[in-house]
Amino acid sequence: MAVGVSPGELRELTDEELAERLRESKEELFNLRFQMATGQLNNNRRLRTVRQEIARIYTVLRERELGLATGPDGKES
């Protein structure tokens, strides 16, 4: 997964793609936290970037839910 995904890139994805991206990010965050607890994590910054990515995905989904933004095909999803 790319580091530092922009909100613009996320807005181009469909709801299904966002849900898949969210699942992958949550799984990665779980693994990073496990590595941190066992002392195997070298890059602590990655925890923050993954959490920010999850927040961005939730924000895009919420914008669509409230009708503040549309899906990538121009229709409301």
From Swiss-Prot:
Gene Ontology BP term (one): translation
PROSITE patterns: RIBOSOMAL_L29 (PS00579)
Xref: SUPFAM superfamilies: Ribosomal protein L29 (L29p)
GO cellular component: cytosolic large ribosomal subunit
Keywords for the protein's UniProt record, in alphabetical order: Ribonucleoprotein, Ribosomal protein
MF-aspect GO terms: structural constituent of ribosome
Cross-referenced PANTHER family: 60S RIBOSOMAL PROTEIN L35/50S RIBOSOMAL PROTEIN L29 (PTHR10916), LARGE RIBOSOMAL SUBUNIT PROTEIN UL29C (PTHR10916:SF0)
Family: Belongs to the universal ribosomal protein uL29 family.
The protein's name in its UniProt record: Large ribosomal subunit protein uL29
